[in-house]
């Protein structure tokens, strides 16, 4: 564990400066203090295979407020808990490469395994409370609703198990299309007893949480067999509008109770959404967009050239967007990229925000605790 301060390297990422030290990931350099400070960092994967050309860590860290541990799954098949001092408190070998991060509720950590096993662990000790085995790779952050844990596989099955003991409750499956699909899966979004889930065949389906019964289904990608995916986790705003994106046909706003289309912005390649207030942020192939939720009007668009923008989060007035190369700091009002920070070989996992603290897992499996300032008032680099 350590921390090194210093000036960063400048490089182009949109129009923002890039800060970091890609050649020496064990010594992350500080960006200007107007943005954040690296409170601590720790390496999690001890040995990197010599033939691993482009390591990738897609599983977001998750914070347990009861134990104050950060729970992380990494590509070496381990789950680790990192304490508030940046030191590993416990570890558990699952042997499976993780595709998504976990969920914490009342001291229990629910973790999806790439080997198809859903784990419930004690956040303080790592003890296994129960596990439920499927035959499919689990690919989304679990959701807790009405006493059930819901999770989606990478082959279009939603599993629901009881949170108390992991007993099977129900499952819903759709057959994937015969053509090419996009990597990723839609986690269920639950609202008022209904789970909204997208599938790789281009359908958005509303399911009853209690038994998995279909409330309605809606095709959003039209005809064809390739890249029909609705892999975005749906979002719902305070007005009750349901937002979801088809990789082929763009961003939709729907009536949550019926699936009726309110509007559609025909922008292909979108893979993640975030709704806050009256604005919907959408990210995907080479772009970050902001839309007005009521009408679908484009507020701004930030091009990223050949980079894919992954799932964004909001923290201290900034939109934080991993783009595989770095973590972008984007002004959510104007769409201007203020800064990019690369701690090593890029970032694929969404950061986890706890107040002004942001936990970031880099692609070379270093976990960083960043303390953010009021970054909207930072320099206009």
Regions of interest found by a model, annotated:
Residues 17-63, 89-105, 128-146, 168-192, ...:
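Extracytoplasmic beta-rich repeat domains
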Residues 10-12:
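C-terminal motif of bacterial Sec signal peptides marking the signal peptidase cleavage site
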Residues 69-71, 109-111, 149-151, 159, ...:
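Conserved beta-propeller blade signature
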Residues 83-87, 122-125, 162-166, 208-212, ...:
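Short loop/turn segments that connect beta-strands within beta-propeller blades
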Residues 74, 113-114, 153-154, 199-200, ...:
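Structural signature of WD-repeat beta-propellers
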Residues 1-3, 212:
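N-terminal export leaders
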Residues 318, 322-365, 372-380:
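C-terminal closing repeat unit and adjoining cap/tail of repeat-based domains
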């Amino acid at each position: 564990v350590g921390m090194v301060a210093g000036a960063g390297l400048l490089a182009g990422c949109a129009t923002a400066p890039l800060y970091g030290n890609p050649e020496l990931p064990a010594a992350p350099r500080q960006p200007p203090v107007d943005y954040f400070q690296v409170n601590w960092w720790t390496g999690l994967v001890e040995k990197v295979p010599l033939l691993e050309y482009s390591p990738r860590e897609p599983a977001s860290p998750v914070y347990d407020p009861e134990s104050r541990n950060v729970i992380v799954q990494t590509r070496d098949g381990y789950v680790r808990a990192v304490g508030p001092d940046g030191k590993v408190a416990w570890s558990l070998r699952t042997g499976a490469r993780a595709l998504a991060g976990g969920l914490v509720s009342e001291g229990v950590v629910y973790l999806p395994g790439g080997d198809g096993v859903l784990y419930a662990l004690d956040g303080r000790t790592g003890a296994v409370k129960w596990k439920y085995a499927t035959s499919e790779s689990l690919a989304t952050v679990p959701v807790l609703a009405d006493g059930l844990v819901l999770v989606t596989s990478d082959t279009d099955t939603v599993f629901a198990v009881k949170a108390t003991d992991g007993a099977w409750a129900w499952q819903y499956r759709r057959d994937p299309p015969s053509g090419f699909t996009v990597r990723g899966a839609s986690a269920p979004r639950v609202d008022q007893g209904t789970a909204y889930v997208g599938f790789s065949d281009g359908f958005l389906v509303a399911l009853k949480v209690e038994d998995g019964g279909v409330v309605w289904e809606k095709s959003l990608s039209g005809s064809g067999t390739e890249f029909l995916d609705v892999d975005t986790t749906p979002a719902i705003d305070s007005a009750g509008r349901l937002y979801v994106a088809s990789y082929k046909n763009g961003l939709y706003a729907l009536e949550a109770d019926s699936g009726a289309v309110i509007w559609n912005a025909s922008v292909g390649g979108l893979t993640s959404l975030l709704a806050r207030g009256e604005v919907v942020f959408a990210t995907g192939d080479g772009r970050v967009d902001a839309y007005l939720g009521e009408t679908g009007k484009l507020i701004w668009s930030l091009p990223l050239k050949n980079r894919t923008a992954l799932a964004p989060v909001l923290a201290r007035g900034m939109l934080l967007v991993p783009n595989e190369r770095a973590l972008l700091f984007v002004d959510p009002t104007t769409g201007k990229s203020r800064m990019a920070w690369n701690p090593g070989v890029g970032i694929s996992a969404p950061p986890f925000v706890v107040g002004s603290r942001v936990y970031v897992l880099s692609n070379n499996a270093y976990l960083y605790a960043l303390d953010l300032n009021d970054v909207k008032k930072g320099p206009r680099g």
